[in-house]
């Protein structure tokens, strides 16, 4: 409202609720003051027309709680109305009045009771409402889900890592129906899961600042549901979470909450779990409040994934050797119990570090192993280092060349390694011994050069030189060729016996016969031979009497059955030979599908073995079974034809005796030919030596 003043002749701005003293000087100072006041008032409207919008609010926060407040409006006293300030037209910000105790969700005695009391139908109804109102903003749907669950699941607070429960707690308590709702909503909002994971984690950290804060079971359930299907969300930006962890290093509860949330990715995937452990937990290993959870998590992770092939390639030398120092170096920042626990995990970490092809990677670990193997290192660590160095030299051929390059600058460490090789030389494979011989000779030449130059580490050079000489003696030492010696002894005995019998023209007059007679062995052997001969004659006469009768009777009784069995056998063999190829093809296809399933879980060597096994039945059928079967059929046909021709259709003892005599004679001739050929070969071998 404005009025025209007669004395001044100018317009004056009239404001309601004018401060004292403002209107007193208005007429004397002219219109400039009025224009400045108008400009100030307009300026307020120009730059702050509405209060700031809370971007993190969700439908649940702005809708569900307001509905509850309106329903309980008669129980809440109305807020006091503040008088408007006359000089400011800015709208006052609404101060959210905290709900009283009657409005808050009551705490249950346990999380199980809270989940049983949760109305799944009401949750689905609220989520449907959220999706209909915010149809194009799936992040709000997810935030509504987390807020609803966390609001309804108010149970007693637990420690941040939930170490007293299973790895999938609290998600393991969720019913199948509720899991379906959660996973269905996560599938609809797949593009917002990474932001939702960050929202849950940061909201949990904010709740930890409140005293007392709400229990965080709803957010934990959402995090576990996300990472169970998409564990890579936690490892997509580990650097960000490491900075977050370091910024809260003075708050162990927040750090453990971050580690717990990221660690849920490992229970679904070993690779992602190792990424989390190496990127988040290894950097804080040694901090008193965080180390127990880090080692416990690693133990649980490796226990849940016994097949370590999925984790090959994740641990490199930069990550492995700090773990070695933590496990074996005394007086470090770990407690003795944690260090002992890490020592028990070390063999599996070593398998992960060496990977699927240690024969091509161990030489990269050799320098760090060698530099740590000092004479002053602890005994347990020295034992592990020397064992690992020996494994490097045994498995990876390139480790020997790396050792030759490092040798002049690591004489004390090399002396320990050489002495260890000397003491365990018999356990090293023969092929590796031959390859190490060249390396040891090279080291011996290096020792001689260092001794001529007068090296400062003269004592270490002398120790290394003595160990090299001992190893070379082990390599080049004389060993009896036992196989050749036994063969030579056998040939000499046979040759002496033949010469003795030939020179004395009889066994009784030979030196061998006299020695056997004087020792008493010859009479005993003659008596045994006589008894054996008499028993053989009795058996021969009994067979001559009974075999023709029993043979004729048996042939009369069994011939129809044999003919029928022979016909069935031929039919069966024909059927199998006709259908065997299809079955083998089916078996090969089955092995192919099985190998494809196991290809991800098994190393390359096992896959190659499976491929060979898949081809083995077909090769065995084609190259062994079929030729043997045809050979057997031909042999049976030839034997049947030969017996029919020899015996003229009648089975008599004389005919069988003749055939057996011919077979024995033919066998004896073959053995004589084989023996003569063996003696000729042995004599030729001896003459070449």
From Swiss-Prot:
Signal peptide (UniProt feature, chain positions): none
Biased composition (Gly residues): 20-31
Localization (cell): Endoplasmic reticulum membrane
GO cellular component: cytoplasmic microtubule; cytosol; endoplasmic reticulum; endoplasmic reticulum membrane; Golgi apparatus
Record has Iron-sulfur as a keyword: no
Region (Disordered): 1-37, 70-107
TM spans (from-to): 480-500, 616-636
Domain of life: Eukaryota
Modified residues (N-acetylalanine): 2
Keywords: Acetylation, Apoptosis, Endoplasmic reticulum, Glycoprotein, Membrane, Transmembrane, Transmembrane helix
Short name of any one Pfam family annotated for the protein: TMEM214
InterPro entries given in the database record: TMEM214
Subunit structure: Constitutively interacts with CASP4; required for the localization of procaspase 4 to the ER.
Name of the molecule in the record: Transmembrane protein 214
Gene (name only): TMEM214
């Amino acid at each position: 409202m404005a009025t025209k003043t007669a004395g001044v002749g100018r317009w004056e701005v009239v404001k309601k609720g004018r401060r004292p003293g403002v209107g007193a000087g208005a007429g004397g100072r002219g219109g400039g003051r009025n224009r400045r006041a108008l400009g100030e008032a307009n300026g307020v409207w120009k730059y702050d027309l509405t209060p700031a919008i809370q971007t993190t609010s969700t439908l649940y926060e702005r809708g569900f709680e307001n509905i509850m407040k309106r329903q309980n409006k008669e129980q809440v006293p109305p807020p006091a109305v503040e008088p408007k300030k006359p000089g400011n037209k800015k709208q006052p910000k609404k101060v959210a009045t905290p709900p009283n105790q009657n409005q808050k969700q009551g705490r249950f005695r346990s999380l199980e009771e809270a989940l049983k009391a949760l109305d799944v139908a009401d949750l689905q109804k609220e989520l449907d409402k959220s999706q209909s109102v915010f149809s194009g903003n799936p992040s709000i749907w997810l935030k509504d889900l987390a807020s609803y669950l966390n609001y309804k699941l108010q149970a007693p607070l637990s420690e941040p890592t939930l170490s007293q429960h299973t790895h999938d707690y609290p998600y393991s308590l969720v019913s199948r129906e509720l899991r379906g709702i959660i996973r269905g909503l996560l599938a609809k909002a797949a593009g917002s899961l990474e932001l939702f994971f960050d929202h849950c984690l940061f909201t949990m950290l904010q709740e930890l600042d409140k005293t007392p804060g709400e229990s965080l079971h709803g957010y934990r359930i959402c995090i576990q549901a996300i990472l169970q299907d998409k564990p890579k969300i936690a490892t997509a930006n580990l650097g960000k979470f490491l900075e977050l962890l370091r910024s809260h290093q003075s708050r162990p509860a927040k750090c453990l909450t971050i580690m717990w949330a990221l660690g849920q990715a490992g229970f679904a995937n070993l690779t992602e779990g190792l990424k989390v452990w190496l990127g988040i937990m290894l950097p804080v290993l040694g901090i008193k409040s965080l180390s127990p959870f880090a080692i416990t998590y690693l133990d649980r992770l490796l226990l849940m994934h016994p097949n370590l092939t999925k984790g090959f390639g994740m641990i490199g030398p930069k990550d492995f050797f700090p773990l070695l120092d933590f496990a074996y170096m005394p007086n470090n920042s770990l407690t003795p119990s944690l260090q002992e626990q890490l020592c028990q995990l070390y063999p599996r970490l070593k398998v992960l570090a060496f990977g699927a092809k240690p024969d091509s990677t161990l030489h990269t670990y050799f320098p760090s192993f060698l530099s740590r193997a000092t004479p002053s290192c602890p005994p347990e660590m020295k034992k592990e280092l020397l064992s690992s160095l020996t494994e490097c030299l045994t498995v990876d051929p390139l480790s020997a060349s790396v050792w030759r390059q490092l040798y002049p600058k690591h004489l004390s460490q090399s002396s320990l390694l050489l002495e260890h090789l000397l003491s365990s030389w018999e356990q090293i494979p023969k092929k590796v011994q031959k390859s190490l011989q060249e390396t040891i000779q090279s080291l011996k030449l290096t020792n001689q050069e260092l001794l001529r130059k007068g090296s400062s580490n003269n004592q270490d050079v002398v120790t290394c030189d003595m160990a090299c000489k001992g190893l070379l003696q082990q390599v080049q030492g004389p060993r009896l060729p036992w196989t050749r010696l036994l063969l030579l002894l056998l040939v000499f005995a046979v040759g002496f016996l033949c010469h003795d019998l030939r020179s004395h023209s009889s066994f009784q007059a030979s030196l061998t016969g006299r020695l056997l007679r004087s020792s008493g062995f010859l009479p005993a052997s003659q008596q045994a031979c006589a008894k054996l001969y008499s028993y053989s004659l009795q058996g021969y006469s009994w067979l001559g009497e009974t075999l023709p009768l029993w043979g004729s009777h048996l042939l009369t009784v069994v011939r129809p059955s044999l003919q029928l069995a022979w016909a069935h056998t031929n039919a069966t063999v024909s059927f199998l030979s006709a259908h065997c190829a299809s079955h083998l093809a089916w078996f090969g296809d089955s092995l192919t599908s099985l190998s494809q399933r196991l290809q991800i879980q098994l190393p390359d060597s096992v896959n190659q073995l499976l491929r060979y096994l898949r081809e083995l039945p077909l090769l065995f059928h084609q190259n062994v079974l079929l030729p043997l079967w045809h050979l057997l059929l031909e042999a049976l046909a030839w034997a049947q034809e030969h017996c029919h021709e020899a015996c003229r259709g009648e089975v008599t003892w004389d005919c069988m005796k003749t055939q057996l005599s011919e077979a024995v004679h033919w066998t004896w001739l073959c053995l004589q030919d084989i023996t003569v050929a063996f003696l000729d070969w042995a004599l030729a071998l001896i003459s070449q030596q």
